[in-house]
């Protein structure tokens, strides 16, 4: 997927010609704990955040390798393996959203390959997934999971990506 201008992004998100509304102003910090080749650029991450967030946010996105991903998952979730994405929310009630999204680059790349998806689409899905967690979405129960998946599909569609679950509708 090519990088789009702000106007193209707004048009893709259904915002062009719409009644002006206050848009989220995400402050996105990017940390690369692994080589950058093949990873999303800051401009892409900012665009995804702009479309996914409903309010102002301060988000750090960190790309890590398998060892760091495994250590974080073990420390914070008690699971001794590298997972694709971890989200850490720091927001207090009534304050701007704040949090970290950690993506384990080799796990995301492997999953994309195994699922026959473009790597960029899988990164976009997992960043949106993390941004939804920062906004209070969860997938612990069936109803919550359905609500979160619907939001992911809607946002990714606005960004020009297909259904990450491979289902139509």
Task: Specify the residue positions occupied by each region the protein language model found.
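An acidic/histidine-cluster motif and surrounding catalytic segment
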Residues: 1-124, 134-169
């Amino acid at each position: 997927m090519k990088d789009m201008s702000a106007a193209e992004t707004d048009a893709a998100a259904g915002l062009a010609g719409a009644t002006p509304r206050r848009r989220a102003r995400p402050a996105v910090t990017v940390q690369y704990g692994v080589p950058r080749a093949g990873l999303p650029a800051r401009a892409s991450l900012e665009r995804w955040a702009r479309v996914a967030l409903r309010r102002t946010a301060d988000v750090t996105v960190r790309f890590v390798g398998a060892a760091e991903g495994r250590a974080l998952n073990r420390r914070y979730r008690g699971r001794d393996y590298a997972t694709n994405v971890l989200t850490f929310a720091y927001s207090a009630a009534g304050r701007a959203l704040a949090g970290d999204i950690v993506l384990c680059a080799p796990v995301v790349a492997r999953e994309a390959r195994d699922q026959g998806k473009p790597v960029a689409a899988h990164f976009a899905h997992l960043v949106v997934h993390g941004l939804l967690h920062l906004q209070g979405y969860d997938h612990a129960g069936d109803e919550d999971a359905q609500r979160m998946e619907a939001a992911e599909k809607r946002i990714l569609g606005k960004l020009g990506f297909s259904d990450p679950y491979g289902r139509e509708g």
